[in-house]
Amino acid sequence: TMQAGLNEYLLYGGLPQILMYNTEEQKVRFLKTLFDETYIKDIKDRYNIRKDDDLEELINIIASNIGALTSPNKLANTFRSEKKSAVSYDTIKNYIDFLSDSFLVEKATRYDIKGKHYIDSPFKYYFMDLGLRNARINFRQNERTHLMENLVYNELRTRSFNVDVGSVSSVGTNSEGKRLRSTLEVDFVCNLGSRRYYIQSAYRMPSEEKLEQERASLLRI
């Protein structure tokens, strides 16, 4: 069924070789081996990385937080506060560049829709294959909402769209009459030539409240 196909894709990704394997064990083994013995080994060899603990931990953090706003500075702070490791901004940035150059992850930059300019930081990082992402964290943290967002991003990139993360601000008043500025996120601002689309990604719309929540930022554009 279509739902079964979607579930399979969200779990094992879209690499063609996956179709050669019939059992879950075979698919998991293939993805883990490909990630560790091909992608990561190539990165370590190509960039002569000898002390690889920080690289490995960075991959885990990004894989565990797909679709979350972050930056090299924020990641460096995470290493200092949670991992007790003083990894510099430059090292984090270099490692992320290595992952991007190896087609493991891709960065989506924030774009101020009303101001018509890019926002320097933070960004979002998406895995270019969900199966590799899931294999990296041992198929834990399979929240459908985040996986669907990553899937939609990948599909838009496959269709040659340039994809940014939208930010839209508005000014309103609270119950006391005070002016308040709020910022809402548009999941994707997609551009291809003269075409532009604004997209919200949601795995489920279980209620009218959820629908209104997803529409709120679009209605402010």
Stretches found by the model and what they are:
Residues 2, 92, 149, 182, ...:
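Amphipathic coiled-coil/heptad-repeat helices and related helical stalk/stem segments
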Residues 1, 156-158, 218-221:
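Alpha-helix C-terminal capping segments
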Residues 1-14:
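Amphipathic alpha-helical segments of the small helical/lid subdomains adjacent to P-loop NTPase cores
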Residues 19-196:
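Accessory nucleic acid-recognition modules appended to NTPase machines
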Residues 191, 195-207:
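Active-site ExK catalytic segment of metal-dependent nucleases
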